[in-house]
């Protein structure tokens, strides 16, 4: 039962018990706030899925030119840190992988929109051109000199070897006046 049906049901029960319509519209008693008359929309309410709204923030961000993020997994093996990012429909030339100062991995790029051919009629376009960026601070044992990246079947895999010989560097800092 939808929320609207249950609200309307409470209103009808209150009226049957002699509470009147009550609420803000005046009818006395009842104490319930009368819902806006939405019974005309009731048949459509169950068809609206909350998952349809889940994509709205990213669609709005893309329309505003705000970069989206790529879904990414990070696993650590004995020898390396391995990052796997979903890049469906992205070509190698459209992705940039870099390690910034202070060991920050940055994946960025732009997914190109398919060119419209003359004589074609599009019925729906959801895969628009969009920029994406993802940054991850790497752990101290990441050896950024040996980074390897590969794009295969829409998955970008970045392997960063571990520097297992590196010991945490601790030092005493002198205090000056």
From Swiss-Prot:
One of its GO terms (molecular function) is unfolded protein binding. Residues 1-35 are annotated as: Disordered. This is 18.9 kDa heat shock protein. May form oligomeric structures. Belongs to the small heat shock protein (HSP20) family. It is found in: Cytoplasm. GO terms for cellular component: cytoplasm. CDD domains: ACD_ScHsp26_like.
């Amino acid at each position: 039962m939808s929320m609207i049906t249950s609200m309307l049901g409470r209103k009808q029960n209150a009226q049957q018990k002699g509470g009147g319509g009550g609420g803000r519209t005046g009818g006395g008693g009842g104490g319930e706030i009368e819902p806006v008359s939405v019974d005309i929309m009731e048949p459509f309410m169950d068809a609206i899925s909350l998952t349809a709204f889940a994509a709205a923030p990213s669609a709005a961000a893309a329309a505003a030119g705000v970069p989206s993020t790529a879904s990414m997994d990070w696993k650590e093996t004995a020898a390396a840190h391995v990052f796997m990012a979903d890049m469906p429909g992205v070509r190698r030339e459209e992705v940039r992988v870099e390690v910034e100062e202070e060991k920050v991995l940055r994946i960025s790029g732009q997914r190109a929109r398919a060119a419209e051919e003359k004589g074609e009629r599009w019925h729906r376009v959801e895969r628009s051109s969009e920029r994406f960026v993802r940054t991850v601070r790497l752990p101290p044992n990441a050896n950024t000199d040996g980074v390897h990246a590969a794009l295969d079947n829409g998955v970008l895999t970045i392997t960063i070897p571990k520097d297992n010989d590196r010991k945490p560097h601790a030092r005493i800092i002198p205090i000056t006046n």
